[in-house]
Amino acid sequence: MSERVLMKGNEALAEAAIRAGCRHFFGYPITPQTELAAYMSKVMPKIGGTYLQAESEIAAVNMVLGAASAGVRAMTSSSSPGISLKTEGISYMAGSDLPAVIINVQRGGPGLGGIQPSHEGFLLLFHDVGDHLVVHTSVVQFQLCLPHLLVGIFAGYIVGD
């Protein structure tokens, strides 16, 4: 039986992506997902991957778009306000049927000053700028579903086409 390891949620997401074959990470630091990017910055060079801190959220998602267009397994992550900046790039990827993993590590405020629950990032599931499905797993499902979900996405499966 394999050894059990206790790690933070951000690090577990990064490790799941790596085990699913992700070798390219493009991101921009924003709390609370900075730990995910920091983990990728340590591990990617050790496995022959690419870690690049972009100059903005928009640049990061467009780097993922370029990588996905070239047929490589790439991902980015952000937090709710950063995901808002990435929606145009996300829509281009969806419209082009390009697989990518985009992690939204949600937080409360500052956009609405905390008048909505801290899970307001879920609104993006239904009100994005494109007409495409967003694959979403709830937190309780991560241990069982996430690695398999990432493998499916990286393999190029388009859900709901």
Label every model-predicted segment.
Residues 128-161:
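N-terminal low-complexity segments that are often proline-rich with Ser/Thr-Pro
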Residues 1-125:
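Thiamine diphosphate
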